[in-house]
Amino acid sequence: MSVAILLSARRRPRPRLALLLLTLLLIAASLVHLGLGARWIAPQTVLRALLEYDPRNFEQRIIVDLRLVRLAAALLTGAALGVAGLLLQTVIRNPLGEPHILGLNAGASLAVVATSALGLSFGAFPAGRPLTAACGAGLLFGGVMALASAGRGGATPLRITLCGVALSGFASAVTAAILILDEQTLLAMRTWLAGDLAGLNWSTLQTALVPALIGLGVALLIAPRLNVLALGDKVALGLGVNLVQTRLLGLLAIALLCGAAVAVAGPIGFVGLVVPHVVRRLVTEDIRLALPLAAPVGAL
């Protein structure tokens, strides 16, 4: 048996062990979070509220009606941004790639703010805000890739990053201009733009969960091709990988994940940058193993 096979055999338990530890940490952190707040609630009361809910108990109502929905929103947002960050860094082959830096969050925010300023309501179509945010993120990142691909040399990681920062600044400026000119939109969106989990309900989370799950499914579907893509375009072409299709599917997954996260909690940065590096320390560069771990790490 070769050394490579021995090393791979030794590494196999690591992703499972890491997933188990992350799950336990996530459960413990969630229980602590549900007890924290303006009114401290003991862990045993939190467990009783989750297992044997009594609507007549005031503390249990605080947990189930207020804190639980915020916890679910935080978990969904962190998991979506973590997976999106890992996927983005893999697609563009840049360890500094992050939805906030490359303009996806800014594009999603601009789309939501613009539709609100135009008076378009999301009430008749509950999934409207997540899909609008996803379209905004996808369009702006598509513009980043098109701008970075222009000229000689193609879309190098450095050019993608520079174009992303430039278009992100432009989208943020347009968003600020809309808010300055429309006071009603400013009042409706100012807390959301700062990154806020207050005022959410289960209906909002359910509609945001659909694009997030679709994005995760697409990411897992193209994970084997992304491993080959990480070796370089020439190698990937030689092994029969359709580069355009793979990158478009990756863009679709990233846009859906970012759209779901932004629709719930507003534009939040840094999570998509740090999570991929943490995951790579826990497992290998294999995207098939890293993707399932990016969600709990981001949620934490």
Residue ranges and their predicted role:
Residues 2-300:
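Alpha-helical transmembrane segments in inner-membrane proteins
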